[in-house]
Amino acid sequence: MNVSKYVAIFSFVFIQLISVGKVFANADEWMTTFRENIAPTWQQPEHYDLYIPAITWHARFAYDKEKTDRYNERPWGVGFGLSRWDEKGNWHGLYAMAFKDSWNKWEPIAGYGWESTWRPLADENFHLGLGFTAGVTARDNWNYIPLPVLLPLASVGYGPVTFQMTYIPGTYNNGNVYFAWMRFQF
């Protein structure tokens, strides 16, 4: 592994830790959030979820063409989760998923997701979501070292079927990836 890759890994982890530190400025806030959001999702889930990865897209403006020509953008895999809707109508989920990454190698990810949910139409089944996910992933090209992730989430859904997505930021020829999956609630 070359020095620039170590710098990139360190920078990524450092930025993630700073972000988490700002969100949870003190332990009481963190424990309250855990107690009110994550623990009930684990202890009393309303739904069991099936995750099916759908697409990975590398932003063409941020990559050399010869790189994107080699990348896998069909991330087949599967995931499972537990979820619930809170009293405000917001979605909370705990999940674990494994999919084929850009290099066609397995990448596991597990974490917690939250989305503020809107139902803008008269049909209450249609919903839009915007939120975040916090979790841990590991990649082949980083020797499967567990890496924390804090990423945005967005979704559009109808009833128990949701198309959910995130964007992984990055630098030139690294990151800048749109990743989306289908989530089926049972």
UniProtKB/Swiss-Prot annotation:
Task: Name one matching Pfam family.
Answer: PagP
Q: What is its main location?
A: membrane
State its location(s): Cell outer membrane
* Keywords from the named record: Acyltransferase, Cell outer membrane, Membrane, Signal, Transferase
Query: Catalyses which reaction?
Result: a lipid A + a 1,2-diacyl-sn-glycero-3-phosphocholine = a hepta-acyl lipid A + a 2-acyl-sn-glycero-3-phosphocholine; a lipid IVA + a 1,2-diacyl-sn-glycero-3-phosphocholine = a lipid IVB + a 2-acyl-sn-glycero-3-phosphocholine; a lipid IIA + a 1,2-diacyl-sn-glycero-3-phosphocholine = a lipid IIB + a 2-acyl-sn-glycero-3-phosphocholine
Q: Which GO terms describe its cellular component?
A: cell outer membrane
Q: Which GO terms describe its biological process?
A: lipid A biosynthetic process
Q: Which residues form the active site?
A: 58, 101-102
Q: Which residues form the signal peptide?
A: 1-25
Query: Which Enzyme Commission numbers does its entry carry?
Result: 2.3.1.251
EC class of this enzyme?
Answer: transferase
Carries keyword Translocase?
Answer: no
The highest taxon in the source lineage is Bacteria
Q: Where is this site: Role in lipopolysaccharide recognition?
A: 67
Q: Where are the residues marked Role in the phospholipid gating as a site?
A: 172
What does this protein's UniProt record list under function?
Answer: Transfers a fatty acid residue from the sn-1 position of a phospholipid to the N-linked hydroxyfatty acid chain on the proximal unit of lipid A or its precursors.
UniProt xrefs under NCBIfam families: PRK11045.1
The similarity comment for this entry is: Belongs to the lipid A palmitoyltransferase family.
What does the subunit comment say?
Answer: Homodimer.
Q: What is this protein called?
A: Lipid A acyltransferase PagP
Source species, please? Shigella boydii serotype 4 (strain Sb227)
